UniProtKB/Swiss-Prot annotation:
Stated family: Belongs to the class-II aminoacyl-tRNA synthetase family. ProS type 3 subfamily.
Compartments it resides in: Cytoplasm
EC number from the UniProt entry: 6.1.1.15
Source domain of life: Archaea
GO molecular function, one term: ATP binding
Identification of the protein by name: Proline--tRNA ligase
GO cellular component entries: aminoacyl-tRNA synthetase multienzyme complex; cytoplasm
Length: 480
């Protein structure tokens, strides 16, 4: 980018759509100019955010008994079409490969929209005995969906570049149920590491994953009040096992169908993180995923310039040895331009070191999240920086948590819901009947997210459609 472009004004965050689109470009996360709708290019800086985010995901999954594997992108049509209910949910979104060179293929090949039909034929061959369970395998791959709605980088794409999908196999329905609960817990932990509070709910039957017994999901509330689905976990029952003939032998020698789950998370995790934490100056990144965690700005005058630069290099070397990602900006840009650049990129901590700081044996630390300035003793720079990182992360999470809680509105009337969902998420009593839920959605003009997983059922209220008493409330929201 030209220097004039780098210092162009970012729209205020209250104009969220414009802010988001400009931020992706100005902070060098994604370039949207690729000549195919819904396909985008990761800049190196954005890809580093992705890599650091997915390092967290891999760590948490690996530490909970999951194993990473890799399955093919292409799925034969005859395998893809086996699960009728599942396919109904995806058939309008599938990309098909029909030719190899100039030859028409005997069997068309689907570009995976999701991988159940690629993985489960292999599970049929792998699963033999109850001793094999649980099988907990995941992969991180690109998937393709022919989106006809308005596409948006990281949020609604035709190529999902970073789809983490886990597929597990179990002996009983109850074991699979426990796995869904574990998955939701793992996802909550991932988002805690990203400083993102979540809503957790069970989707209504008409919005569950095609072919599943039920779906639990995580949503974030975005700055414009809409919710973004950022994780799902599906109990598949034995539905896919029957379709793909996945059986195991019990201790008594009996052959039974297995029970399965699958759960996914994508680059929407990054969309939520940058949207919730960012501000009018640009990105505000949690230290753990920031490509540059500390930027050192030498404050140089003619006298003492060499000593200042030497001190900056020493600090960088020490912090790097401590596992911290550091850059020194010794460019010819004026200090204000340097601050602008690194604030836009969301660097969590800026260290300023000048001649007077050297005399006092300190660096001036400036936090990106609050703008607070504080001196850190140079002999204790490693511990001082690490302490700042912990404080920054906790502040980002607590601030976002308060914002989320302030955007959840308890309602009893549908007209009230219509008003409140302009700013966030409403809750409303629901009897649980499909016809009442659908009627509510029609009146409100928005969807039921689901029943909160941690809901307290301590009072009876009336369903606004049929008047039946219920202890259940549901989340209602505008969604992406």
């Amino acid at each position: 980018m030209a220097e004039s472009e780098k210092e162009a004004a970012l729209p205020p965050k209250e104009e969220f759509s414009e802010w988001y689109n400009e931020l992706l470009w100005m902070a060098e996360i994604m370039d949207v100019r690729y000549p195919v709708k819904g396909l985008y290019v990761w800049y190196p800086f954005g890809f580093a955010i992705r890599r650091n985010t997915y390092n967290i995901i891999r760590e948490i999954l690996d530490n909970s008994g999951h194993q990473e594997a890799l399955f093919p992108l292409l799925i034969p049509e005859n395998e893809f079409m086996k699960e009728a209910e599942h396919i109904k949910g995806f058939e309008d979104e599938v990309y098909w490969v029909t030719h190899g060179g100039r030859d028409t293929l005997d069997i068309p090949l689907a570009l995976r929209p999701t991988s159940e039909t690629a993985i489960y034929p292999m599970y049929k061959m792998w699963v033999r005995s109850h001793a094999d369970f649980p099988i907990k395998i995941y992969q991180i791959v690109n998937t393709f969906r022919y989106e006809t709605k308005h596409t948006r980088p990281l949020i609604r794409l035709r190529e999902i570049t970073s789809f983490k999908e886990a597929h597990t196999v179990h002996a009983t329905w109850e074991d699979a149920e426990a796995q869904v609960k574990e998955a939701i817990g793992l996802y909550t932990e991932i988002y805690r590491r990203l400083g993102v509070p979540v809503l957790r709910s069970r989707r209504p039957d008409w919005d569950k994953f095609p072919g599943a017994d039920y779906t639990d999901a995580l949503d974030a509330i975005m700055p414009d009040g809409r919710t973004l689905q950022i994780g799902t976990a599906h109990h598949l029952g034995d539905n896919f096992a029957k379709t793909f003939d996945i059986k195991y032998e019990t201790p008594d020698g009996e052959q039974r169908y297995a029970y399965q789950t699958c759960y996914g998370i994508s680059e929407r995790s990054i969309a939520a993180t940058i949207s919730i934490h960012g501000d009018d100056k640009g990105l505000v990144l949690p230290p753990e995923i920031a490509p540059v965690q500390v930027v050192i700005i030498p404050i140089i005058f003619k006298k003492g310039a060499e000593e200042v630069l030497a001190a900056c290099k020493d600090v960088k070397e020490r912090l790097t040895k401590a596992g911290i990602r550091v850059e020194i900006d010794a460019s010819d840009l004026r200090p204000g331009a340097k601050y602008y650049k690194w604030e836009m990129k969301g660097v969590p901590l800026r260290l300023e070191i000048g001649p007077r700081d050297l005399q006092n044996n300190v660096a001036v630390a400036v936090r990106r999240d609050t703008g607070e300035k504080e001196q850190i003793s140079l002999p204790e720079i490693e511990a001082g920086v690490s302490s700042k990182f912990e404080a920054i992360h906790e502040n980002l999470y607590q601030k976002a948590k308060v914002e989320l809680e302030n955007r959840i509105f308890e309602c009893t009337e549908l007209e009230e819901v219509k008003n409140k969902i302009q700013d966030g998420v409403a809750t409303i009593p629901w009897c649980g009947k499909r016809e009442c839920g659908r009627a509510m959605e029609d009146v409100i003009g928005a969807g039921i997210l689901g029943i909160p997983l941690e809901q307290k059922r301590d009072r009876k209220e009336k369903c606004p459609i049929c008047g039946e008493e219920t202890e259940t409330r549901v989340y209602v929201a505008r969604t992406y």
